[in-house]
């Protein structure tokens, strides 16, 4: 049985961004979300020792849910620009680390995580997210690490 670690990338980025003070790189760019994301990722790898890792991201585009319900996520505040600027840096870091990530215009990260957890139900799947909606995926082979 393989250990598969699935990570809600947007959730971790938001958590790191709001949890840490506004850290800056030597060039002056804000990097608190990158720093926090990296620390949480390394901690999860050390704790779970996964055979496979995938980080799922939202693309921030309207999905099929917006067509079904016009007010879907209408109450959400827009993502801060200085957080948006850190997403490409995290993706570059993941590439450098050899960690796969996936995003799709049509789906949100939790859709991707749900699909992958279902497809790998014969394995030990650990989902890392603070999104309580993902609790519905928990079963004998899928656990949720709330961050």
Predicted regions and their residues:
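Noncatalytic, basic helical substrate-engagement surface that gates or grips nucleic-acid strands
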Residues: 2-128, 132-147
